[in-house]
From Swiss-Prot:
Gene3D superfamilies: 1.10.287.140, Leucine Dehydrogenase, chain A, domain 1, NAD(P)-binding Rossmann-like Domain
Name used for this protein in its record: Glutamate dehydrogenase, mitochondrial
Organism, as annotated: Chaenocephalus aceratus
Binding-site list for substrate: K93, K117, S384
SUPFAM superfamilies xrefs: Aminoacid dehydrogenase-like, N-terminal domain, NAD(P)-binding Rossmann-fold domains
EC assignment: 1.4.1.3
Keywords assigned: ATP-binding, GTP-binding, Mitochondrion, NAD, Nucleotide-binding, Oxidoreductase
Amino acid sequence: ADAADKPDDPNFFRMVEGFFDRGASIVEDKLVEDLRTKETPEQKKGRVAGILRIIKPCNHVLSLSFPIKRDNGEWEVIEGYRAQHSQHRTPCKGGIRYSMDVSVDEVKALASLMTYKCAVVDVPFGGAKAGVRINTKNYSDNELEKITRRFTIELAKKGFIGPGIDVPAPDMSTGEREMSWIADTYANTIAHTDINAHACVTGKPISQGGIHGRISATGRGVFHGIENFMNEASYMSMVGLTPGVQDKTFVIQGFGNVGLHSMRYLHRFGAKCVGIGEIDGAIYNADGIDPKALEEYKLQNGTIVGFPGAKPYEGSILEADCDILIPAAGEKQLTRNNARRIKAKIIAEGANGPTTPDADKIFLENNVMVIPDMYLNAGGVTVSYFEWLKNLNHVSYGRLTFKYERDSNYHLLMSVQESLERKFGKQGGPIPVVPTADFQARVAGASEKDIVHSGLAYTMERSARQIMRTASKHNLGLDIRTAAYVNAIEKVFKVYNEAGLTFT
């Protein structure tokens, strides 16, 4: 084994491949059985094994080095990567992270997770991921802009970005600002004649072709995912909790975009956040932490440490007392070293790859339910898909239907009112039909935000049902991750099988 593959620190790409293999071993016979071809059983087996071999590896990995000039006049060489795992559906899709932990292995692993994630939630993209190896705290805004714009040009030169080729998105230490720089650079250089140029990246500000609800999408999806599984009484009896998120306690590791918005939505629907951990310290309050107050404190102070609404927490926040643990930071946080000390009954993977295979086995033995990353944090790519469609359609959701829907709703109310008055109005004059508060809010038709929110909620619910059906069909119990991989493999397999090979 290579140096990085210590028992408790598995190679990240191989870790994802291991999870894939577990899913493939369960579904392989069924795939052979379902093939409607005239081949012999042996040929069918060979075809299935061959396609599974095609799915697994990362198709393209681009490694880049490029110079920038620092504010002090010094020259520096920056390293970056973009991995495209699969082109069974195009474009490829996946975030860009700025972190000192970026490596070829990490980018390949995250790209492969993106392929399976898109398949699980029925978003028609292949998986990709990019990383730039920098610590953003050591660079000025001006320097970060130079790095981002130059990285975009380097990707474009190699054909690794474009609305129909490969569409990046925000990830760790990147957000709307960086996406705006990417879109602007691409649209003003290599794609200055392409009307769809701004669809080259998602997670943009609204003024640059972004979509309402994208910033909170991953956290909102995490909430919907937790809710879908926690409302299922059969699962909750396995882990020993009552159904529903109401009054449950939760702890979050990582108070970035995903952590903050997961906390906000869970709090809004009656769950209680008792602990938050970040790289520089953790806080705990058994009576609950207010998300708004903590968000404001972090904005002002750049840290959660010292927040007056909670006490400092010594030791690992992952091991704190709670019902739901949400790792929303880096990968490989839950390992065989700490898995037995985790008190939560539900682990909701907001981050990508936070659980090692060894920890996964321990959780299954201990009846802890892990809601896997490839389903749970797919809210981000789902709403990115909506944004990409909006860019290709060149019109915001609801723009053409607003007035028509509103008028139709009022006509409906008047029609009911007039019918009632014709029948009963003789005795007492007019019978006003007044919309309820909830209906009044919807009378005007769906805004873009409403459409995004309902589309996301529907996606998370439908995918959860598919995963639950698969888990029950294959008697997987609490092994939700394997059920999700089985679903993803079936869908990707179908595309490869029916497309055939390009040149054989």
